[in-house]
């Protein structure tokens, strides 16, 4: 299993969250690092640039990783970025994919479309034309069509999970406030 996150976030997994959950994460920056780390733990962590720029190769990832979590998934927020295209190409064959984000960009539901595209739950181009229309007040902007809103949220609820607080998952909210 590999977590992919911004470089500044990796220590949260390695030092804090991983040990608390009984997971021994190892940071990897290239195929050789990953081979060594897999001898010690099944929990790997890297940053987006290592995959995007090829230090962790497509061949290695597809041969060794069965589950991947993109932390701070807003990195997928645009169809024309090198990161989004690379991740879709390289990681689409990983059987278990998960995208985590504190929140999609405020009022930009298109990010949910990009997440679904990465997860294999919908083609971003088709989804954008199905549920979104041009904003007549702002050039180049799309907005969720009001008559499609219910259908859009039903579709999102078929593949997404929204968690607001620990009790949403059956845990105590004490200390969360």
Regions found by a protein language model. Give the residues of each.
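Conserved strand-helix element at the start of the C-terminal RecA-like helicase core
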Residues: 3, 7, 169-175
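Conserved nucleic-acid-binding Ia/Ib motif block in the N-terminal RecA-like helicase ATPase lobe
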Residues: 2-43
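Short secondary-structure boundary/capping segments
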Residues: 1, 34-37, 59, 88-90, ...
């Amino acid at each position: 299993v590999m977590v992919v996150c911004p470089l500044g976030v990796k220590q949260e997994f390695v030092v804090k969250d991983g040990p608390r959950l009984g997971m021994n994460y190892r940071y990897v920056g290239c195929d050789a690092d990953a081979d060594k780390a897999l001898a010690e733990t099944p929990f790997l962590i890297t940053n987006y640039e290592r995959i995007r720029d090829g230090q962790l190769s497509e061949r290695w990832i597809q041969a060794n990783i069965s589950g991947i979590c993109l932390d701070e998934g807003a990195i997928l927020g645009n169809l024309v970025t090198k990161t989004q295209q690379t991740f879709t190409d390289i990681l689409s064959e990983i059987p278990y994919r998960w995208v985590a984000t504190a929140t999609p960009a405020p009022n930009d539901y298109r990010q949910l479309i990009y997440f679904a595209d990465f997860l294999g739950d919908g083609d971003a181009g088709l989804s954008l034309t199905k549920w979104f229309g041009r904003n007549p007040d702002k050039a180049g902007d799309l907005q969720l069509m009001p008559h499609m809103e219910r259908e859009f949220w039903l579709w999102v609820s078929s593949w997404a999970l929204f968690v607001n607080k620990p009790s949403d998952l059956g845990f105590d909210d004490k200390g969360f406030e």
